[in-house]
Amino acid sequence: MSNIRPDEISSILKQQIERYNESVKIENTGTVLQVGDGIARIYGLDNIMAGELLEFEEKTIGIALNLETDNVGAVLMGDGRDILEGSSVKGTGKIAQIGVGDNLLGRVLNALGNPIDGKPNPNSTDYRLIEFNAPGIVSRRSVCEPIQTGITAIDAMIPIGRGQRELIIGDRQTGKTSIALDTIINQKEENVICIYVAIGQKASSVAQAVTLLEEKDALKYTVVIAANANEPATLQYIAPYTGAAIAEHFMYKGLATLIIYDDLTKQAQAYRQMSLLLKRPPGREAYPGDVFYLHSRLLERAAKLNNELGGGSMTALPIIETQAGDVSAYIPTNVISITDGQIFLSSDLFNAGIRPSINVGISVSRVGSAAQIKAMKQVAGKLKLELAQFDELQAFSQFASDLDKSTQAQLARGQRLRELLKQPQASPISVYEQIPMIYAGINGFLDDIKIDRISLFIKKLQECLSNSYPHFYEAIKESKQLSKENEEVLKKAITEVKKNLSFI
């Protein structure tokens, strides 16, 4: 029998120890105590983060929202019908994130970024957190470039700048979505990436919007995120943050983006449902105490970045639905205080055939006027005041038996200006075509034209300027202002059109 040498044994043991590379995987696991109504109560999960993604035994994903002393309250991102009491849950160690990139353009996705348009899965290589901190004060610059909506009433009186948050507010069926979609359609020549987030809507309404964008060749630069009415409240709650993450990807690449949240009332209702089921204390209108933070952290992500960060921008157009025009309700007042202005749509104006049904008196843009082009400022400076005075006079004239000539003239001009601002859906007008229209109206050139023929006159005026004076539009595009020479050309064109069509 050969002698066993101790040094050989020790060297073999050392080699074995060095080769040993078994990694220990520690999993944070828990047990389902209770499940129902899209909520799960879980025992265990001691080292879980707030907002961490959880994976249930049957592969449903949830988000940990309530971290209590003896259990964790989680919301489910599916129906959760196969989750059983006593089944295991594990923490993923990840916060919700979404794949981003150029391959999302033209796609319709759900709130988790999965395609629902029947096309192949967009294999994204870049990922962004759904919840992300808004840019700080130093990272931003003031709003200085316009975002043209193509809607004359907005571009002239309530201008929106890149990086602004402008609320669209009104009752149901007053044309809020139409304004948002028209704005997307008008970005075709503007090189703006658009994200449309549909929250809690009927699938048929979303399909209609997608079809319209496709017909107008606008889907190629748009991403649609849809969390339909039949989907869990969790998905309706996170859909706006998913949209914001996609917009941020393009913004930090130096591009201009436009995001529409249609509508945040439904997101707040979904969040209220989740909070009440999680037994969080209810506040005003049964909303939880942090419902203001729900919207503020979302809308603060819209910004115009400084040049060091690439100069990109995210413009947000949140939509809020009111009940019987009540803008003093909880959610409307919250969002009005967060945003940089609001476009108020009136059901009375809508029913009177004035579309878009914008109530000029209480609509305002707090920062957009700095971004308005000089030519529009020159011609539209008095437009808002004229229309506000007209509304006041019109209300007064209903009770007055005889009116003096100056009042009659003011009423006549107001009616023509209002007619001028009427615009059919999905037919945006470029800002350069809006300028001659407003100039003609505000300077009294339409006062002697019958109201029912104003739209025809405007059409002929634009044709005349395009065909006979093509340099007119080119000069405005270059200089962004209406020079004395161009003003004379415009007056000449107006006189010609009036003469040819014998309007007087």
Curated annotation (Swiss-Prot):
Q: Does the keyword Lyase apply?
A: no
Q: Where is this site: Required for activity?
A: S363
Which positions bind ATP?
Answer: G170, D171, R172, Q173, T174, G175, K176, T177
Q: Which family does it belong to?
A: Belongs to the ATPase alpha/beta chains family.
What subcellular compartments does it reside in? Plastid, Chloroplast thylakoid membrane
Q: Which PANTHER family does the entry link to?
A: ATP SYNTHASE SUBUNIT ALPHA, MITOCHONDRIAL (PTHR48082:SF2)
Question: Subunit structure, per the record?
Answer: F-type ATPases have 2 components, CF(1) - the catalytic core - and CF(0) - the membrane proton channel. CF(1) has five subunits: alpha(3), beta(3), gamma(1), delta(1), epsilon(1). CF(0) has four main subunits: a, b, b' and c.
Pfam families, per this entry? ATP-synt_ab (PF00006), ATP-synt_ab_C (PF00306), ATP-synt_ab_N (PF02874)
For this record, the Gene Ontology CC terms, alphabetical, are: chloroplast thylakoid membrane; proton-transporting ATP synthase complex
Which GO MF term does the entry hold, naming one?
A: ATP binding
What protein is this chain from?
Answer: ATP synthase subunit alpha, chloroplastic
Query: EC number(s) of the enzyme?
Result: 7.1.2.2
- SUPFAM superfamilies named among the record's database cross-references: C-terminal domain of alpha and beta subunits of F1 ATP synthase, N-terminal domain of alpha and beta subunits of F1 ATP synthase, P-loop containing nucleoside triphosphate hydrolases
Q: What does this protein do?
A: Produces ATP from ADP in the presence of a proton gradient across the membrane. The alpha chain is a regulatory subunit.
- Which organism encodes this protein? Cyanidium caldarium
Q: Which domain of life is it from?
A: Eukaryota
Alphabetized, the UniProt keywords read: ATP synthesis, ATP-binding, CF(1), Chloroplast, Hydrogen ion transport, Ion transport, Membrane, Nucleotide-binding, Plastid, Thylakoid, Translocase, Transport
Task: Quote the InterPro entries the UniProt record gives.
Answer: ATP_synth_asu-like_sf, ATP_synth_asu_C, ATP_synth_asu_C_sf, ATP_synth_F1_a_nt-bd_dom, ATP_synth_F1_asu, ATPase_a/bsu_AS, ATPase_F1/V1/A1_a/bsu_N, ATPase_F1/V1/A1_a/bsu_N_sf
Which reaction equations make up its catalytic activity? ATP + H2O + 4 H(+)(in) = ADP + phosphate + 5 H(+)(out)
Q: Indicate yes or no for the key word Kinase.
A: no
How does the protein associate with the membrane? Peripheral membrane protein
